[in-house]
């Protein structure tokens, strides 16, 4: 984009409630990429005004997620910055001052109405306009005194201006709202606690946010915020109103908006499932943006270089788990053997396949085995099943029940018996010698097709139908362990 200000400042402002959602990650990613592309500032603040729902556990999960993904922030928790504090729960004096200044200039008014009274008036009038009806906008001194005598405590509402509000949305183009359909809205609770409707724009103003990139679900709140920004500018609190861009919905199964209840929505679960952070980010970037029409796989450096918010597609994007796994698999193929080995180690240790620390013999065996599986695993967790058979002792070795039932039947055991006889005669225990012996005995002598010949042997030795290459695996496993497993498969 050619007309960007010299200093771009964007923010991510999650609420620490519940498990972080992939929609949060997509929004954070687009803000991060936008800031990095324009050599700007990525601000991270915590919207914890909902004291009942905000938890330390959720905050820790958000920090953990951002660190794992490599979405580094320039200002915010744990790094500080010129606009600290970055927790809304610690900025109460700032919000109270803003409220007082808004009230002094008559941008707000006290509202004593109950929800029941508002609903009753709407039903009585037959109005179809939802929200507050402005009843308390111009209370007389007597009316106010009467409400106070009843012990009512008011909320503070912002006076929406007459007319219409138009802005150029960075994703959707020009958007206009008639303010008669945007009711006066509350800025704080009756107990004085500020609401999101106040603290979000006030924080953006004080932190000098230039661009607000957020989900489409917040589109309808934008005219309210633009009106509030105009007031904050008049009061000298805001230097300017930020530009807005509303990102497309992420849809789940059945073409419904992906919700926190959907299993694929939980962002940290992808780490547990063995996704690479770069693979997950690449896929989430595709939910509304593309680096090129004929290209899906790219690095974050490439995304930063190419990212333009104007290229974001406003239409809803559908979350496709198969596509996500395919993108992750492509990134797995880009890893060097050393890096892939480093990435799978925590999963192998966590599953008990390897000790912590890894003993020297297992380290050497892993280095020999990784080239066999590097092109076969699509997620880091798959290394456990693919490599586990090499490291487990014979007393703990097990076979997949379904695979054993299918391939180690009477015909399969007959193949295993002949394989055992042939391999017991092998002198040098090497990949080539193992392959030659089994090929001669099972395929040529028995006349069994290779698939039917080697499948039972594979399950007998590795425990699974899917494994690294059989002959190489048997060489790594060694003569004694390979023959022992063939014997145990015969019962």
Swiss-Prot record:
GO molecular function, one term: ATP binding
UniProt key word Aminoacyl-tRNA synthetase: yes
Residues annotated as binding ATP: 260
Any single Gene Ontology cellular-component annotation: cytosol
InterPro entries noted in UniProt: aa-tRNA-synth_I_cd-bd, aa-tRNA-synth_I_codon-bd_sub2, aa_tRNA-synth_I_cd-bd_sf, Glu-tRNA-ligase_bac/mito, Glu-tRNA-synth_I_codon-bd_sub1, Glu/Gln-tRNA-synth, Glu/Gln-tRNA-synth_Ib_cat-dom, GluQ/Sye
Superkingdom of this protein's organism: Bacteria
Motif interval(s): 'HIGH' region: 14-24
Subunit structure: Monomer.
Protein name (database record): Glutamate--tRNA ligase
Phylogenetic placement of the source organism: Bacteria, Bacillati, Actinomycetota, Actinomycetes, Propionibacteriales
